[in-house]
Amino acid sequence: MLGFGRRRLFSALLQVQKRPCQPSRNMRLVQFQAPHLEEPHLGLESGVGGGVVDLNAFDSTLPKTMVQFLEQGETTLSVARRALATQLPVIPRSQVTFLAPVTRPDKVICVGLNYADHCQEQNVRVPKSPIIFSKFSSSIVGPYDEIILPPESKEVDWEVEMAVVIGKKGKHIKATDVMAHVAGFTVAHDVSARDWQMRNGKQWLLGKTFDTFCPLGPALVTKDTIADPHNLKICCRVNGEVVQSSNTNQMVFKTEYLIAWVSQFVTLYPGDLLLTGTPPGVGMFRKPPVFLKKGDEVQCEIEELGVIINKVV
């Protein structure tokens, strides 16, 4: 399994100790903070669980948010590729705080019942077309941030998901053209208040969009890095126990179909997120049902993408 990293609090160090190191050949874009920086920067994660190369230090003309970086397309990606090929100082992982790789996107689009084995555990039919809902972008937090249990809910559940990050604006995108509009992939946790999914006329939004209900990260792994995003192991652990374990090959509707479908209705913008559904093993379908409680630790992991670890408070 992939190695696990943990969020580090800011230290009292006055200067960041850096060591030269060749970054990973795979492009793993991150947003991060460090004690010596006045504001968040963009960086390259030096492999899963590795330190960070500061892209803004490499080229001060680069934007400092991922959405702006993606909006500039090939211009900024070419700079990141140059940095990837250069031996640059790496800030140790212990000295950085990872933010969500994308913050405040225009849209967070989600897909329900998109794993065949998840449909089986509910004894429901596989959908004939995608079931689309959303989360507000205010629900996004970093890969090692805390999940806050809202006092309004007693049934907060886990859902590991692969998220697709849009890299190019598009509307009415053909399935054959979809990947030209995709920047890459990341790990998402679609935290869900089941009781609120069943209220409010059974509109799912309120149950999905409490603050901190969308941990994301640790990196935006560019599409050229992943040989087949629809053949990746995906799992979730609660307090070390595996509760979800499947493969993205179980998706009913793959990335190309989903984005083509959604783009019929809305224009997609750089930084938009598409959460592609969760596999079986969620708490509400256990007998008896199990829900998250204070003190729990949830690890969501996807092969090649990494792991996010969030404590419940």
UniProtKB/Swiss-Prot annotation:
Chain residues that bind Mg(2+): 159, 161, 190
Pfam families documented for this protein: FAA_hydrolase (PF01557)
A Gene Ontology term for the protein's cellular component: mitochondrion
Keyword Isomerase in record: yes
Primary location class: mitochondrion
PTM sites of type Phosphoserine: 129
Enzyme class: isomerase
Protein keywords: Acetylation, Isomerase, Magnesium, Metal-binding, Mitochondrion, Phosphoprotein, Transit peptide
Family to which this protein belongs: Belongs to the FAH family.
Purpose of the protein: Tautomerase that converts enol-oxaloacetate, a strong inhibitor of succinate dehydrogenase, to the physiological keto form of oxaloacetate. It is thereby required to maximize aerobic respiration efficiency by preventing succinate dehydrogenase inhibition.
Protein name as it appears in the record: Oxaloacetate tautomerase Fahd2a, mitochondrial
Biological classification of the source: Eukaryota, Metazoa, Chordata, Craniata, Vertebrata
